[in-house]
UniProtKB/Swiss-Prot annotation:
This is tRNA uridine 5-carboxymethylaminomethyl modification enzyme MnmG. It comes from Ureaplasma urealyticum serovar 10 (strain ATCC 33699 / Western). The gene is mnmG. Belongs to the MnmG family. GO terms for molecular function: flavin adenine dinucleotide binding. It holds the Pfam family GIDA. The keyword Ligase does not apply. InterPro entries: FAD/NAD-bd_sf, GIDA_C_N, MnmG, MnmG-rel, MnmG-rel_CS, MnmG_C, MnmG_C_subdom, MnmG_C_subdom_sf. One of its GO terms (biological process) is tRNA wobble uridine modification. Its cofactor is FAD. It is found in: Cytoplasm. Keywords: Cytoplasm, FAD, Flavoprotein, NAD, tRNA processing.
Length: 614
């Protein structure tokens, strides 16, 4: 068969991002997948974005990746999350038409140069002298390549669970990968067993929406893609709805806990902390009288609704009782029952920050096989693995994004340095520099890199540079124009020799209020938004940078005075659990524990100072 520069195993979100990046970088690429049904599939929540994750998709786009364009082209609803808070946590979330999303990618694959799609199962890796040379398919055909990127998602020896019923299959009834786990073990890789799950799907026409809380989208023009945006008109967007569990729901779950695959002992894999099953919520948060559930559409073409926040591994008969105890779903028709899925992943500490294996040269890993969760996290890793394949092919140094450069850098540093014990999810709290890692400035942080490596098209980069020029011109005007020079502003409480940039820092003042006096005509809302954020939050960003410098000097502070970390205020349950288990000797050791961030370290330091002074 034809020899390729790169083979990508798996056509999920990591694999697609990797394959499009390598082929766009002029590397002959083979994309191998078990089943065409799995291309770009969204087996769980059909959405892209959310806190931290939406910023990651913006970062992917800034580097020249494809996920943002796909999401914009197939969205059913767009929202800006956390808009009432500071810009460090603003994020875009899109409800995606999962049928259109897959169709979009399949069409792009057909049109993509340097990319061949192969429907087959990889049964072995060709490795000589610790260098990967290609793959062997299950029909014994050999495909040679200089590099291999493994992006098998949740399919390695995957098993689905509904109560005591276990099925040897992949997500949504697809085929699973039966051979690669054993191949990796023989090569010396340590594997971990993880678990995730997905809720039931309900027939839309059987739902009573009367008493549900309506969750519409936004009429603002927002998109993931910086310079190729596709906007979904407000009147074409589909609404989501919110309902809540009740005591009847909780009682059904409590009475049947032993039938749950997870609580009945059928599942050994560790599930995601930040996306727990409904059983987990009832057990771990027993004091809560109700839990929120999102009722969300899956496609313009499907009459199915997704119950976000209601995943379970209960048997079918129990699921029916649980679902019909929910308001509006009393007489619903269940189209597909929930399930949990177990799968193999590698310990990601066996990877370099480039995502290349430490054990086998030219072998890269990306996505959920690295112990992460989420479409956005997967796509970001696929992109970075592809970029570093290209860098190595050109005999250049790998591109490793810093924690202060991108959420992508935070994630990769976390998983390769600290490893994972549960499916890793990106959170804004994991980033020490989150005021600098904003939704609005992904282009400032990463477009130069995307352009220099050859992924970002020159015309896109030129447009970015033109926008940057306008931003700097407006900032210069604000810095050099005094209040006294504007007749309408002479009677403000600011001194007339104060500059407009100081006036703009007032919370009640908007940049649009001042631009009417500006000789530079700016109409692009993206430019206006970026200038306003830079000015209004300049002080916060400088303070955060200073705090980070101080926190780096805390390494010699001992922790033997803390018996139980529940005593420490304002740290998460995850942090408490891990600190109580590991019992770090000092703050330096505590800071290296997965899930413990610099905010937690600051809270611990404050607590130690307080008990010392008491």
């Amino acid at each position: 068969m034809k020899k390729y520069d790169v083979i990508v195993i798996g056509a999920g979100h990591a694999g697609l991002e990797a394959a499009f990046a390598t082929s766009n970088l002029n590397l002959q690429t083979a994309l191998i997948t078990l089943d065409e049904k799995g291309i770009g599939m969204m087996p769980c929540n059909p959405s892209i974005g959310g806190p931290a994750k939406g910023i990651v998709t913006r970062e992917i786009d800034a580097l020249g990746g494809i996920q943002g364009k796909a999401a914009d082209a197939t969205t059913m609803q767009m929202k800006i999350l956390n808009s009432s808070k500071g810009p460090g946590v603003w994020a875009i979330r899109a409800q995606i038409d999962k049928i259109a999303y897959q169709r979009w990618f399949k069409q792009q694959i057909k049109q993509q140069k340097n990319l061949d799609l192969i429907i087959a199962e990889v049964s072995d890796l060709l490795v000589e002298n610790n260098i990967v040379k290609g793959v062997i398919l299950s029909d014994q055909k050999i495909i040679q390549a200089d590099y291999v990127i493994i992006t098998t998602g949740t399919y390695l020896k995957s098993i689905t669970h509904r109560g005591s019923v276990c099925v040897d299959e992949g997500a949504d009834g697809t085929k699973n990968a039966k051979f690669l786990s054993d191949v990796l073990v023989k090569l010396g890789f340590e594997l971990i067993r993880l678990k995730t799950g997905t809720p039931a799907r309900i027939k839309k026409d059987s739902i009573d929406f009367t008493n549900m809380v309506l969750e519409p989208g936004t009429n603002q023009k927002i998109a993931f893609s910086h310079y190729h945006p596709v906007y979904k008109p407000y009147d074409k967007q589909l609404p989501c709805h919110i309902i809540y569990t009740n005591e009847q729901t909780h009682q059904i779950i409590r009475e049947n806990l032993n039938k749950s695959a997870m609580y009945g002992g059928m599942i050994s894999g560790i599930g995601p902390r930040y996306c727990p099953s409904i059983e987990d919520k009832i057990v771990k948060f027993s004091e809560k009288p109700r839990h929120q559930i999102f009722v969300e559409p899956e496609s313009y073409e499907l009459d199915s609704m997704y119950l976000g926040g209601f995943s379970t591994s209960m048997p079918i008969d129990v699921q029916e009782k649980m679902i019909r105890s929910l308001p509006g779903l009393e007489d619903c028709e269940i189209l597909k029952y929930a399930y949990a899925i177990e799968y193999d992943a590698i310990d990601p500490t066996q990877l370099y920050p480039s995502l290349e294996s430490k054990l086998v040269n030219n072998l890269f890993f990306a996505g959920q096989i690295n112990g992460t969760s989420g479409y956005e996290e997967a796509a970001a890793q696929g992109l970075m693995a592809a970029i570093n394949v290209s860098q190595k092919h050109k005999n250049k140094e790998p591109i490793v994004l810093g924690r202060d450069q991108a959420y992508i850098g935070v994630m990769i540093d976390d998983i390769v340095t600290k490893g994972v014990v549960e499916p890793y999810r990106l959170l804004t709290s994991r980033a020490e520099h989150r005021l600098a890692l904003r939704n609005d400035n992904a282009d400032d942080r990463l477009m130069k890199i995307g352009f220099e490596i050859g992924l970002l098209k020159p015309e896109v980069y030129d447009q970015y540079l033109n926008n940057l020029k306008q931003i700097n011109e407006v900032l210069n005007w604000l810095k050099t124009t005094t209040v006294g020079q504007i007749d309408d502003l002479k009677f403000t409480t600011l001194k007339t020799n104060s500059y407009l940039i100081d006036y703009l820092k007032r919370p009640e003042v908007k940049l649009n209020d001042l631009l009417i006096y500006c000789p530079i005509k700016i109409e692009d809302e993206q430019i206006i938004n970026k200038v306003q954020i830079q000015v209004k939050f300049e002080g916060y960003i400088k303070n955060q940078e200073e705090n980070l410098k101080q926190l780096k000097r805390l390494n010699n502070i001992k922790l033997h005075g803390i018996v139980d970390y529940k005593e420490v205020p304002n740290i998460s349950l995850e942090t408490i659990d891990k600190l109580n288990k590991i019992k770090p000797l000092d703050l330096e050791q505590a800071s290296r524990i997965s899930g413990v961030n610099l905010t937690d370290i600051a809270m611990i330091k404050y607590y130690l100072e307080r008990i010392k002074n008491d």
